[in-house]
Amino acid sequence: MSDIKKVVLAYSGGLDTSVIVRWLQDTYNCEVVTFTADIGQGEEVEPARAKAEALGVKEIYIEDLREEFVRDYVFPMFRANTIYEGEYLLGTSIARPLIAKRLIDIANETGADAISHGATGKGNDQVRFELGAYALKPGVKVIAPWREWDLNSREKLLKYCEERNIPVEMKKGKSPYSMDANLLHISYEGINLEDPWAEAEEDMWRWSVSPEAAPDKPTYVELTYRKGDIVAVDGQEMKPHVVLETLNKLAGENGIGRLDIVENRYVGMKSRGCYETPGGTIMLRAHRAIESITLDREVAHLKDSLMPRYAEVIYNGYWWSPEREALQALIDQTQNYVNGTVRLKLYKGNVDVVGRKSDDSLFDEKIATFEEDQGAYDQKDAEGFIKLNALRLRIAAGKGRKL
């Protein structure tokens, strides 16, 4: 263990990572550099500085990454209309590549020979952090304390703090759930949620009112798109992270974005989790709406066929992989004409698309109309089209093939 001289730790300032700081110092006799990222988790990150200083940390990195997170990770993901297993908007998964990147950047800047994280040995995050780290710095050493130590309960962690005089802040009103938050979503796991039959308690949800308690009057919002990304809300241009903050507020007020699922983790187990992704729920509906009038049919269908694979790549932690980059290049190319405006109605947990328009629209009213089209579409042409497409079916039926 003496070959480890300096470690960069993904540090939240909470119980687990505060214990990890001291554990790394004691176990590896190394210097610890802490890195705390503000990706919109809704908590002050600056107090992490004082906590790290109290633990003897000399190099402390605290960074506001909200704009980079939404611009370079969330928006590219939403260009693909990405959902995992038909429901999950990948709020936790998409935050890990940026954190892994900054851990490696800081390791390079400080001359550290290892990185460390507080992900457990049961979850997906250990995979996501470490796959990203190895892709960006192949020879880096990764220390995952939860896979090494025997501090496998909150009681043992608190006892460790008491024995070593590590200050622990016990917040009043702190949720008993295991939670993870960023600008895209907040997740809840543990306690009664470990029973897939138990309904989540109403006071668990932090970002949204219940649909029943949402206003009786709908809220309308218009989103402007440029090359597949939202650039304005109700005509007001905004930076990407401000767009998401704005949509989170609007959606949360209208009871939008709650999800309760059992998902298949990459490590092999099934896990029940509850998620609030208010702004992301709006973004998914709106993006599909603007694509519906601007994308060629076959391009849209190709994108839809690739989306589950793209979602799986991100969920499993392969953001920094050649397959993700190849898929991203194709997805981004499809967005060149995804420009225009979508109007949505938000009402008691529902997001309804009520209008869409674009200068790049492929919707031709003269052809699509049920009224007189002045010869724009000759209905007689349909007969040959149908006969050609039925040819294989007619041949098979003529040979006596049974379906």
Curated annotation (Swiss-Prot):
Q: Does the keyword ATP-binding apply?
A: yes
The biological pathway it contributes to is: Amino-acid biosynthesis; L-arginine biosynthesis; L-arginine from L-ornithine and carbamoyl phosphate: step 2/3
Principal location listed in the UniProt entry: cytoplasm
Pfam families reported in the protein's UniProt record: Arginosuc_syn_C (PF20979), Arginosuc_synth (PF00764)
GO function term, MF aspect, one:
argininosuccinate synthase activity
Residues noted as binding L-aspartate in the record, renumbered to the chain? 120, 124-125
What does the UniProt entry say about where the protein is found?
A: Cytoplasm
What catalytic reaction does the record list?
Answer: L-citrulline + L-aspartate + ATP = 2-(N(omega)-L-arginino)succinate + AMP + diphosphate + H(+)
Tell me the superkingdom of the source: Bacteria
Uppermost EC category: ligase
- Specify the protein name: Argininosuccinate synthase
Task: Name the species this protein comes from.
Answer: Marinobacter nauticus (strain ATCC 700491 / DSM 11845 / VT8)
User: What lineage, starting at the top, does this entry show?
Assistant: Bacteria, Pseudomonadati, Pseudomonadota, Gammaproteobacteria, Pseudomonadales
